[in-house]
Amino acid sequence: MMDVDRSIRVAVDTGDVTLGSEKSIQSLKLGKGQLVIVAANTPKDIVEDVEYYTNLSDIPSYTYEGSSVELGSVCGKPFTVATLIVNDPGDSTILDDLR
């Protein structure tokens, strides 16, 4: 899990990442993004929306093993992050790591 944490942090720091459920779902509806990451404790209705739109847009999703608090911390944010979309991984190898 540490490698995933580091890859997420590098993507946040050097790439283009959209944080938050509403913005993530909006991006999925438009078919934007390369990878969706969902925290393990994300509410069921949000998970269902993410799964529905990832299936429509063929964007892969990954369930982060930690909570939204832990995912927020990994992103370097002082708030919870239930979902995020990696638009551009930057220097991160996250797309290769999770495939």
Swiss-Prot record:
Which Gene Ontology cellular component terms are annotated? cytosolic large ribosomal subunit
Q: State any single GO MF term.
A: RNA binding
Q: What keywords is this UniProt entry annotated with?
A: Ribonucleoprotein, Ribosomal protein
- Which GO BP terms apply? translation
Per the UniProt entry, the disulfide pairs are none
Q: Which family does it belong to?
A: Belongs to the eukaryotic ribosomal protein eL30 family.
HAMAP family linked to this entry: Ribosomal_eL30
- Name assigned to this protein: Large ribosomal subunit protein eL30
State the organism named in the record.
Answer: Methanobrevibacter smithii (strain ATCC 35061 / DSM 861 / OCM 144 / PS)
| Gene, per the UniProt record | rpl30e
